[in-house]
Design a protein with these regions (language model features):
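N-terminal secretory-pathway/extracellular module detecting exported/lumenal segments
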Residues: 1-47, 51-105
């Protein structure tokens, strides 16, 4: 895994599936939850557009799973709003995307 949050969630990404287009990096990530969410999900995958030049990201697709590591029944799928987000300083998301940018520039 790449990093772990304070509450024990682990974040991964598939290095061999990273794609670059212009200044953007596109990647599939996975979050493995320490304990199931209130909805019963144990993990989720996400497809993200990452702009390392000004450090922002846009989630393009999310898929939620009943079991750990993206296994089991899909409980929900979604396409988030088409807007950029900026990771909170010191957050696990900031650490995760910093690592992705470092490894793929």
């Amino acid at each position: 895994y790449v990093t772990k949050s304070v509450d024990g969630h682990k974040f991964y990404y598939e290095k061999d599936r990273v794609r670059k287009s212009g200044k953007y990096i596109y990647l599939w990530g996975l979050t493995d939850l320490l304990k199931p969410s209130p909805y019963g999900d144990s993990s989720y995958t996400f497809y993200t557009q990452l702009d390392c030049s000004i450090f922002r990201f846009k989630d393009l697709k999310s898929i939620y799973y009943k079991k750990s590591m993206g296994e089991g029944e899909i409980t929900a799928e979604g396409t988030p709003k088409d807007e950029w987000s900026y990771p909170k300083p010191g957050s696990v998301i900031e650490k995760f995307y910093n690592k992705v940018c470092e490894e793929n520039q």
